[in-house]
Amino acid sequence: MIAEELSDQNYMVRTRSEMYKIPYKEILYISSSNHSIEIITEKENFRQMISLREVLSHLPAYFQQCHRTIIINMKKVTCLTDNWVVLNGKEELPVGKKYLEKIRSTFLSQ
């Protein structure tokens, strides 16, 4: 039971020699390039060899894809335009047209 509760609050990252627990609340966004992802947190960044689609399937519903290469933590969104989201008042990321309506709907309902 405790392990399940921890997994509900953290994302596990495995590198070649280390494992990290990253609290979901600290994740700003996740970006992908070259068959790997980079998890951007408030304190540091982590790299993992995994697809963006696979990561998204393991995240809570408040993580949403806003671009073909980016997943954002909707709890961190402070501003939304037709082309951009702003996270924590400073990190600006693109929003693809394909994802805009879902992002807007979630943003307005929070």
Residue ranges and their predicted role:
Residues 1-88, 94:
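Conserved binding/recognition cores within well-folded domains
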